[in-house]
Amino acid sequence: MIFDLDGTLTDSAEGIVASFLHALEHIGAPVPPGDIVAQIVGPPMDDTFRAMELGDDAEEAIAAFRAEYGARGWAMNALFDGIEALLVDLRAAGVRLAVATSKLEPTARRILAHFGLDQHFEVIAGASPDGSRKAKVEVLAHALSQLEPLPDRVLMVGDRSHDVHGAAAHGIDTVVVGWGYGKADFPDGAPASGVTHAATIDELRRTLGV
């Protein structure tokens, strides 16, 4: 079973948004309109900045974000209620666990270790610092290669549409949790092939059978 990190295991929006705003202030760029959390928490941050038409300032914004997030933003974070107990019960049931996140892998490892969750995961896969691996489909490929031989069934648990699309590219179904940052990705909650919705941790437990 492969878990996303931001918006699935941890409530990380505060630190990500604060670091994002710091980066924009650093280069003198305006804050985009609309729901900032929905726009930036989940997708690769490099892609977010490069899509903002910042020109030559995009790379400087990325560097400023990484510096601020590495210094302070990563710790502005909290576990969602019930997550640790769920992981304990899944492991007790013999389920192999992994993390696949678009966050930089060293940062993901730091966060999971901070919360004492790293012990539960056989594999922690994230984006590479050199940018060669960042899209969800790439991060999932990195995770799956380390899990071989794969079990008969692999399941993704995430909160955003890119979790669903990345998993589907590998033939993996996704459980979309309702406490994350992807509500705008699934506006009508309409059934979709290979996708199950779990609004609460109790619903997720029922879906996973633990």
Regions found by a protein language model. Give the residues of each.
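Acidic, Mg2+-coordinating phosphoryl-transfer loop and its flanking beta/alpha structural elements
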Residues: M156-T196
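Metal-dependent phosphoesterase signature
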Residues: R50-E84
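A short, structured active-site edge motif that brings together acidic residues
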Residues: I36, D118-R133
